[in-house]
């Protein structure tokens, strides 16, 4: 009967319980563990939100360290799934970029876990409306569109 009551408690709890196989073992470095698909999707969401904020000129409201860490996770996955080894020039660039982003994350992360609360400053009413999209800026740009939006984000 304890089994059933335990299962009911687990199902009725508001936060889902993490499986034990995803938790890192104490004393081991988590950087050697490849990111799961769920972690990669979360990283992609963080980077996409950062790109949207940069497009709205709100990049000062983001945790840049968290975005850098998410970008490093995505680069690591691209390196592994693309089978770029450390001997190829592309693999070397990916390693350097990942190391830079991890260093940036460790030195600039606020540790708050989320973006700071928005300030109470009112937007100026005299801001002009954005110009209509050009023909070459239509949707379907893919990853290149996000790269263009986030171009000056980490500066």
Swiss-Prot record:
Record GO cellular component, one term: chloroplast
Stretches that traverse the bilayer: none
Keywords of the record: Abscisic acid signaling pathway, Acetylation
GO biological process terms on file: abscisic acid-activated signaling pathway; regulation of abscisic acid biosynthetic process; response to heat; response to salt stress
GO terms, molecular function: mRNA binding
Compositional bias segments (type: Basic and acidic residues): 95-106
PTM-bearing positions, type N-acetylmethionine: 1
Residue ranges, annotated region (Disordered): 1-37, 85-155
Bias-annotated ranges (Low complexity): 120-130
Domain of life of the native organism: Eukaryota
Protein task: May be a negative regulator of the ABA signaling/synthesis pathway.
Subunit structure: Interacts with DEK3.
Name under which the protein is recorded: Nodulin-related protein 2
């Amino acid at each position: 009967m304890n089994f059933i009551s335990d299962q009911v408690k687990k199902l009725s709890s508001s936060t889902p319980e993490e499986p034990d196989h995803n938790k890192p073992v104490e004393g081991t470095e988590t950087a050697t563990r490849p990111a799961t698909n769920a972690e990669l999707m979360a990283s992609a969401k963080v980077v996409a939100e950062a790109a949207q904020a940069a497009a709205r000129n709100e990049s000062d409201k983001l945790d840049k360290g968290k975005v850098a860490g998410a970008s490093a996770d995505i680069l690591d996955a691209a390196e592994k799934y693309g089978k770029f080894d450390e001997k190829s020039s592309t693999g070397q660039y990916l390693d350097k970029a990942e190391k830079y982003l991890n260093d940036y994350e460790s030195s600039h992360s606020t540790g708050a876990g989320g973006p700071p609360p928005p300030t109470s400053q009112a937007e100026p009413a005299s801001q002009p409306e954005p110009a209509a999209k050009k023909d070459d800026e239509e949707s379907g740009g893919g990853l290149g569109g996000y790269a263009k939006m986030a171009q000056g984000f980490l500066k």
